[in-house]
């Protein structure tokens, strides 16, 4: 059995023991590191859930889009960063503009619009991933992603902080950081695993079904690729095939197959990110409809 399973079980058990001990401390009148009673606060748990969902989706997109730009299109790091600028600009505009222009906006509605914008942006990108796609296809999706992330950023911090008294703000800050870090870690791991699994399955299946690939190459590929296929650019793959003394015709077949498999893997991984964003919409019920008092400016 994979050691990952045992680590997950051990982590779950450790978390259970930790929470039981924190509950014991709270019930005995001592000060716990985290008061378990905080999780009975619907507004707080709603905000933390949205932070977790946001960073899960965000991390998955930030993992896959640079792969498309830097590996599939073989852009430099600088060129890749330039293509992501629309996201940064839109995020800044939305995060700063929404509280200023609509200080009494319904937080739940803003969060839902933010998640919807992120999801639509991802789906637009999925639809544009075809063999002839260029770097320009990421502009609109990144703009929509940025608007969505900015909308969430404009609301979630105030939602969580205003859910508890000032005396517990430090605990809430710790929980918020935990939710974001956990979401980012899980998003990268989940989306990355799905991407590599899809890439591996597609390439192996394509090699096995291709009559132009020699039987010896098929057998070697099945053995060597069983543990996963690296996400390689065309030039990287050609170098590896040349070093392996693969014939030019067979090498071209494999390069073409890898190109198709990369796009399929990216589409599946991004589709999963979109599904996670869509699912998060069903967990926004605990976000309040009224703006927290701290967000609403007092009348002069």
Language-model-derived ranges and their functions:
Residues 1, 22-24, 38, 43, ...:
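Transmembrane-helix exit segments and adjacent C-terminal regions of multi-pass membrane proteins
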Residues 1-4, 65-83, 124-138, 198-211, ...:
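Membrane interfacial helix motifs at helix-loop boundaries and amphipathic/re-entrant anchors
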Residues 3-6, 27-171, 187:
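Transmembrane core module of solute transporters
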Residues 8-20:
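Hydrophobic core of alpha-helical transmembrane segments in multi-pass integral membrane proteins
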Residues 12-15, 92, 119-120, 126, ...:
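Small-residue-rich packing faces within the transmembrane alpha-helices of Major Facilitator Superfamily
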Residues 19, 23-28, 100-104, 130-134, ...:
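Transmembrane helix-loop junctions in multipass membrane proteins, especially transporters and channels
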Residues 51-58, 177-184, 264:
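Membrane-embedded alpha-helical bundles that form the substrate/pore pathway
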Residues 61, 67, 138-226, 285:
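Small-residue-rich alpha-helical segments with characteristic i,i+4
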């Amino acid at each position: 059995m994979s050691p990952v399973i045992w680590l997950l079980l051990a982590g779950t058990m450790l978390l259970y023991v930790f929470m039981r001990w924190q509950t014991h401390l709270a019930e005995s009148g001592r000060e716990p590191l985290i008061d378990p009673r905080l999780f009975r606060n619907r507004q707080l748990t709603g905000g933390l859930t949205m932070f977790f969902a946001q960073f899960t989706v965000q991390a998955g997109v930030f993992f896959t889009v640079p792969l498309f730009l830097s590996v599939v299109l073989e852009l430099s790091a600088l060129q890749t960063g330039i293509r992501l600028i629309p996201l940064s600009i839109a995020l800044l505009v939305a995060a700063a503009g929404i509280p200023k222009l609509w200080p009494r906006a319904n937080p739940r509605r803003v969060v839902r619009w933010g998640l919807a914008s992120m999801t639509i942006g991802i789906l637009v990108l999925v639809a544009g991933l075809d063999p002839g796609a260029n770097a320009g296809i990421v502009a609109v999706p990144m703009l929509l992603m940025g608007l969505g992330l900015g909308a969430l950023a404009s609301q979630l911090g105030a939602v969580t902080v205003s859910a508890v008294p000032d005396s517990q703000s430090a605990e809430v800050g710790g929980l918020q950081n935990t939710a974001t870090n956990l979401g980012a870690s899980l998003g990268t791991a989940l989306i990355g695993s799905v991407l590599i699994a899809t890439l591996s399955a597609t390439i192996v299946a394509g090699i096995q079904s291709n009559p132009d690939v020699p039987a010896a190459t098929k057998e070697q590929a099945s053995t060597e690729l069983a543990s996963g296929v690296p996400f390689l650019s065309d030039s990287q793959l050609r170098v590896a095939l040349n070093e392996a003394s693969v014939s030019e015709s067979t090498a071209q077949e494999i390069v073409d197959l890898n190109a198709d498999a990369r796009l399929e893997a990216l589409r599946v991984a991004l589709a999963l990110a979109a599904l996670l964003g869509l699912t998060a919409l069903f967990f926004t019920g605990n976000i309040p409809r009224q703006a927290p008092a701290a967000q609403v400016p007092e009348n002069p």
